[in-house]
């Protein structure tokens, strides 16, 4: 018996990609943006097919993402931001609502929403995940978006 496997590839199909980016903690977020754009371009996406949309912070990213999905015109949305834990419960509220909101948008509109919003305990962890020891989570989110666009195209073709 041969099992059939369907999985996405990182070869960019024709498509447009939106990066919805929270400006708060920009010293980290800009590295995520650079990583995401670099990963998309290295995998065949033209810069003219990438649009960066800036929101004030991570809490606002889901609403902006919803509007982008609602308007159409993009094959995937890549959410990028950074929420760094402080001394109050604010971190839990922002991180949780951002995560839930992005998942809802993806399911509601049937569009891949790649999650590149860092939720970390310290500035050091944020820096590590934006291009040093732990790689670049922006680039990883971009690869996730490419793979999901490919996978959904295959599923829709069946």
UniProtKB/Swiss-Prot annotation:
A GO molecular function assigned to this protein is: 6,7-dimethyl-8-ribityllumazine synthase activity
Name the residues annotated as catalytic in the UniProt entry. 90
List the record's Gene Ontology CC terms alphabetically: cytosol; extracellular region; riboflavin synthase complex
For biological process, the GO terms are: riboflavin biosynthetic process
Which coarse location class describes where this protein primarily resides?
A: secreted
Catalytic activities: (2S)-2-hydroxy-3-oxobutyl phosphate + 5-amino-6-(D-ribitylamino)uracil = 6,7-dimethyl-8-(1-D-ribityl)lumazine + phosphate + 2 H2O + H(+)
Q: What is its EC number?
A: 2.5.1.78
List the InterPro entries hit by this protein, alphabetically. LS (IPR034964), LS/RS (IPR002180), LS/RS_sf (IPR036467)
UniProt modified residues of type Phosphothreonine? 88
Name the residues that bind 5-amino-6-(D-ribitylamino)uracil: 24, 58-60, 82-84, 115
Arranged from A to Z, the UniProt key words for this protein are: Phosphoprotein, Riboflavin biosynthesis, Secreted, Transferase
> Pathway, per UniProt?
Cofactor biosynthesis; riboflavin biosynthesis; riboflavin from 2-hydroxy-3-oxobutyl phosphate and 5-amino-6-(D-ribitylamino)uracil: step 1/2
Localization per Swiss-Prot or TrEMBL: Secreted
Q: Entry's Gene3D superfamilies?
A: Lumazine/riboflavin synthase
Organism superkingdom: Bacteria
Does the keyword section mention Lipoprotein? Answer: no
HAMAP family in the record:
Lumazine_synth (MF_00178)
- Family of the protein in this entry: Belongs to the DMRL synthase family.
Record text on subunit structure and interactions: Forms an icosahedral capsid composed of 60 subunits, arranged as a dodecamer of pentamers.
**UniProt function note:** Catalyzes the formation of 6,7-dimethyl-8-ribityllumazine by condensation of 5-amino-6-(D-ribitylamino)uracil with 3,4-dihydroxy-2-butanone 4-phosphate. This is the penultimate step in the biosynthesis of riboflavin.
Its recorded name reads 6,7-dimethyl-8-ribityllumazine synthase
Name the gene that codes for it: ribH
